């Protein structure tokens, strides 16, 4: 197969012009722009075959044309006799009359050059040298397009390359044989008179020879009696140029230049698939019927027609946009934007939309919108990578027993950390700021019991109310919970919250009644209080084990551990497959200055080894190093083992799932998709709904406190953020957390704070490097905290300080108008007697008449005692004053007051 060629090169090989070849390519469906465009080998082969077949047809047409075509054309005048027949046998020098039929045997003279518009006479083939060169080209252009096969058997209309219909139902006429109707005679050289019914070569070829006729050259109408009657469908006579063929069945005596009335014309197909001509009558097409049916089924919302869901369920991810919703239901996103605007919500098509907004729009068009939960969304993501989380691989024979994971929960300062210190024989609580736990600690301890050593994994969760989310994560990651309640304090709010977390996680609870060594301890009271919350002691006929202990004096600690083991063995089947790829949960994560991101994880199933590719939430990496709770290196970690993992590219969120994947590429893709979905969800959550009603209020200036949060671990930052966002002061001020992160305060944080006028809250971290110098230079305020509730209190105080002050009116005195004096310089002067307190110059006053307040914001513009100006007048003295309110009368009471700022609670 030949290589690629340009259009003009192939045209030269085929012996045609580039214009003709371009037209042929378009007819064949190959849309080529210019003659310099290249053509693929299959198209070249197709064009060669087309022109080879066309060449054979042209040769056959040339062979049959002199004999067949003129004979058939000259046969028509002989069938119908004219009213006045032409005389046969004209002189050789005389031109034939317009109505005379040519003789079949007549041939043109060898030396005679026919007119450009003349065609060969019947019976003789024209010689190649008898016509001029441009005439041959014009004839070739005129004949060639008609000899080409057209798609669909019709000719394209005018210059519309997309049309496939003809301009009329009649066939396009070919070149007429000369002499059939009023052929021009080779008259005198000076004879410019237009012939009667002169013919012209039909087609798209250029006009050759002859001058353009003028009105003086117009011939008079011929006598119809002297002309042969036309056959139906023949062309009318021409005035200087040939008439066009008339429609079939409507021929008549031709008048110069007018075409015969055609039959019913078919509509021409327009460009780009639009139907042309008059609309069709009759039955509608299936497409039209289906389109009309779909339009009728659409639901109108605020003037916008949208598809009616009919109660269908649409599942959308968190933070989905209107474009995602439109893709699900097959609608135009712009239509959804307009519909939501008509409902009072202003949202763009690509912005993340809240769940409430999506459900509101779905209910309007009869769709039930279900926002996929984070768990389902993550499961679908893992399934797309052929991964599963939460199931052991293999059969029951692959499962082995694993140690229980126990969470110690309870109210703040009830002794949870002291209990763990006693079990581990360490002093963990001494290192906590303020004596309260502000992170989750994970430890594994071996306990010597009567039946041998047993391993237990402990999780210590914070008890402060700000750490609700951390306690919930601790409950979800554990098998059993120890509820610590102080015997001298009783059930407290965080105690109840811990019970609810345990019930939600469906885990058994062992109650440790602590501090029984104190004189005011009352264990029976604790048992009675917990019975109200569903924790019934065994001695009361329930199924909850209660153990009275003293963590400080190491009383009954072994009994508590034995109760934990018994409960785990009786109520739980703790097994896992250690031979599969590791799966676990991140209990805590922080950014270490020397080691980078460090995540504390508990392996739930499988075994984690050095070098494994892991993904933890939106962080991924390869396990570079693992440490246990004592700082020792660990090569591999089995089920229920807590370890610190290094090697991640970022700090994961507390509670994120850990998963070992095939390679780093898969881990990176999963982490990237999780990060994108997380950002979309946060945008939808942070976006404030703006309705048309409160648009003016939103546009007004409001006081906003911008904060940047930095902490030592992800859980503390999350707890601090939730606690700060829960502060309710007033709608006049807003709290905006523009950034959050784990690790020391950096120069990037300071630059962002300077650009956004924000305050940096540093929790258990300090500024590093030149961040402090830059903060001092930029005037950025960095607040350092080690106890969370102090940060909450100061931020709340700052928000209250941003509130607009409230002013209270306090009366300072009163005066009665006794007389009025007119002055051209200052207006009306009120002669008054101060009856109470005192009045001051430029002070605010109320004007009271007959017990009604006439105005409440008047002002004393001038104050005099006799002829002297005075700043204030006390009770019992007369004075003259000029008020800013001129409509005053004798007997009016002037009440002076001042506005005093009132502190806001």
Swiss-Prot record:
Biased amino acid composition, Pro residues: 89-125
Region G1, annotated ranges: 410-417
Transmembrane segments: none
Chain intervals with Gly residues compositional bias: 233-276
UniProt KW keywords: Cytoplasm, GTP-binding, Initiation factor, Nucleotide-binding, Protein biosynthesis
Region (Disordered), start-end ranges: 50-306
MF GO annotations: GTP binding; GTPase activity; translation initiation factor activity
Region (G4): 514-517
Pfam families reported in the protein's UniProt record: EF-G_D2, GTP_EFTU, IF-2, IF2_N
UniProt-recorded name of the protein: Translation initiation factor IF-2
Organism name: Corynebacterium aurimucosum (strain ATCC 700975 / DSM 44827 / CIP 107346 / CN-1) (Corynebacterium nigricans)
Classification of source organism: Bacteria, Bacillati, Actinomycetota, Actinomycetes, Mycobacteriales
């Amino acid at each position: 197969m030949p290589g690629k060629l340009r259009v003009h090169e192939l045209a030269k090989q085929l012996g045609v012009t580039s214009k003709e070849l371009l037209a042929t390519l378009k007819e064949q469906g190959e849309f080529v722009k210019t003659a310099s465009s290249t053509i693929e080998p299959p198209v070249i082969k197709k064009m060669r075959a087309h022109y080879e077949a066309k060449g054979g047809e042209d040769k056959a047409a040339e062979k049959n044309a002199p004999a067949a075509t003129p004979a058939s054309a000259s046969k028509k005048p002989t069938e119908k006799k004219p009213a006045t027949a032409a005389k046969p046998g004209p002189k050789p020098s005389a031109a034939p009359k317009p109505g005379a039929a040519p003789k079949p045997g007549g041939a043109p003279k060898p030396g005679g050059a026919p007119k450009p518009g003349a065609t060969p006479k019947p019976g003789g083939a024209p010689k190649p040298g008898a016509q001029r060169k441009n005439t041959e080209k014009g004839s070739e252009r005129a004949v060639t397009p008609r000899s080409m096969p057209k798609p669909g058997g019709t000719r394209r209309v005018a210059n519309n390359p997309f049309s496939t219909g003809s301009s009329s139902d009649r066939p396009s006429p070919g070149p007429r044989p000369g002499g059939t109707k009023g052929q021009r005679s080779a008259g005198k050289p000076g004879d410019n008179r237009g012939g009667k019914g002169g013919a012209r070569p039909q087609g798209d070829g250029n006009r050759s020879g002859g001058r353009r006729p003028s009105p003086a050259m117009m011939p008079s109408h011929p006598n119809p009696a002297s002309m042969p009657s036309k056959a139906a469908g023949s062309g009318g006579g021409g005035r200087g140029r040939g008439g066009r063929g008339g429609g079939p069945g409507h021929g008549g005596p031709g008048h110069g230049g007018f075409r015969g009335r055609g039959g019913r014309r078919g509509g021409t197909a327009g460009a780009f698939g639009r139907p042309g001509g008059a609309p069709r009558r009759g039955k509608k097409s299936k497409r039209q019927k289906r389109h009309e049916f779909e339009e009728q089924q659409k639901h109108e919302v605020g003037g916008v027609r949208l598809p009616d869901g009919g109660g269908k369920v649409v599942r959308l991810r968190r933070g989905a946009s209107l474009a995602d919703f439109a893709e699900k239901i097959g609608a135009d996103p712009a239509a959804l934007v307009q519909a939501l605007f008509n409902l009072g919500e202003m949202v763009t098509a690509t912005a993340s939309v809240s769940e409430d907004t999506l459900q509101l729009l779905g209910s309007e068009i009869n769709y039930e919108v279900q926002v996929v939960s984070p768990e389902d969304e993550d499961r679908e993501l893992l399934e797309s990578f052929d991964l599963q989380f939460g199931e052991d691989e293999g059969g029951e024979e692959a499962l082995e027993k694993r140690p229980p994971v126990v969470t110690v929960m309870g109210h703040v300062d009830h002794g949870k950390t002291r209990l763990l210190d006693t079990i581990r024989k360490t002093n963990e609580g001494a290192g906590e700021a303020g004596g309260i736990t502000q992170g989750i600690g994970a430890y594994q301890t071996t306990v010597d019991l009567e039946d041998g050593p047993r391993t237990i994994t402990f999780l210590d969760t914070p008890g402060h109310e700000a750490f609700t989310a951390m306690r919930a994560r601790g409950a979800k990651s554990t098998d059993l919970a120890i509820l610590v309640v102080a015997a001298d304090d009783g059930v407290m709010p965080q105690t109840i919250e811990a019970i609810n977390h345990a019930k939600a996680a469906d885990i058994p609870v062992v109650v440790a009644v602590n501090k029984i060594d104190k004189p005011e301890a009352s264990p029976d009271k604790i048992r009675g209080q917990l019975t109200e919350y569903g924790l019934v002691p065994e001695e009361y006929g329930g199924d909850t084990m209660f153990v009275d202990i003293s963590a400080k004096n190491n009383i009954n600690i072994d009994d508590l551990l034995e109760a934990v083991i018994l409960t785990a063995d009786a109520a739980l089947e703790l097994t896992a497959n250690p031979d599969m790829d590791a799966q676990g949960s991140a209990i805590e994560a922080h950014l270490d200055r020397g080691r980078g991101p460090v995540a504390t994880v508990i392996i739930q199933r499988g075994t984690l080894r050095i070098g494994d590719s892991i993904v933890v939430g939106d962080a991924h990496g390869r396990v570079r190093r693992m440490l246990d709770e004592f700082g020792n290196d660990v090569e591999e970690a089995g089920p229920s083992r807590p370890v610190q993992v290094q090697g991640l590219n970022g700090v994961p969120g507390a509670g994120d799932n850990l998963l070992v994947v095939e390679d780093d590429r898969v881990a990176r893709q999963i982490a990237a998709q999780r990060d994108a979905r997380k950002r979309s969800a946060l945008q939808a959550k942070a976006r404030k709904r703006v309705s048309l009603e409160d648009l003016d209020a939103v546009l007004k200036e409001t006081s906003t406190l911008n904060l940047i949060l930095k902490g030592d671990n992800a859980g503390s930052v999350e707890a601090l953020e939730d606690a700060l966002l829960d502060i309710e002061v007033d709608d006049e001020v807003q709290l905006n957390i523009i950034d959050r992160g784990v690790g020391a305060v950096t120069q990037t944080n300071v630059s962002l704070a300077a650009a956004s006028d924000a305050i940096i809250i540093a929790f258990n971290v300090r500024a590093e490097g030149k961040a402090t110098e830059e903060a001092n230079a930029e005037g950025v305020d960095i607040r350092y905290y080690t106890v969370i509730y102090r940060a909450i209190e100061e931020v709340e105080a700052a928000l209250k300080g941003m509130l607009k002050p409230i002013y209270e009116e306090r009366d300072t005195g009163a005066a009665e108008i006794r007389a009025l004096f007119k002055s051209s310089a200052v207006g009306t002067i009120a002669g008054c007697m101060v009856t109470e307190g005192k009045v001051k110059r430029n002070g605010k006053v109320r004007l009271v008449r007959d017990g009604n307040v006439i105005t409440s914001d008047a002002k004393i513009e001038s104050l005099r005692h006799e002829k002297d100006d005075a700043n204030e007048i006390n009770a019992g003295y007369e004075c003259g004053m000029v008020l800013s309110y001129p409509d005053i009368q004798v007997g009016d009471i002037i009440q002076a007051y001042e506005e005093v700022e009132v502190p806001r609670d």
